[in-house]
Amino acid sequence: MYAIYKQKKYDAELRLGKDVTLYSYMKDEGFENYVDPLGRESDDFFSKKMDIHELDYLYEVKYEFLYRGHYFKALSTMIRKLIDKDYFEIAAGIEKYDLIEKLGFKRLDESTWWKDIRRKDIEAIKIIEEPEGIFKEQGLKIKILEGKAIDDFLASVKD
């Protein structure tokens, strides 16, 4: 989850629908040294607790990959390590059973199937920005990347 606070993007966590914690590797104004659940204090990672109403925006990002003419949820996370290994996973539910059987998906659990694919198999990436909390009414923002834009996006991903 991400938050925009004072026009800057942060990793964020939402609790109880209103309590937000921002995370940063920079000690921005009002941020304190992060303390993990075991009580260890970090010198290079910081956090700031706040009410959701103090934010400019709060959202979750989800991805879908266009594979053989159909969009599927990205099951693998968008992290550098997996991108460098050219490893992507897609998932589908029972509603697409005939299609996933034909495309060689494997059963993950009772209602979900998955398949690992490579970059060359991805025809497009749909980036879905879903507002959270009090920002939900703003609606989804969807961006579709194709061709070189996919490669540029994947090259820009950091951990």
Residue ranges of predicted features:
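Short, surface-exposed polybasic-aromatic patches that bind anionic ligands, especially phosphate groups
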Residues: 1-159
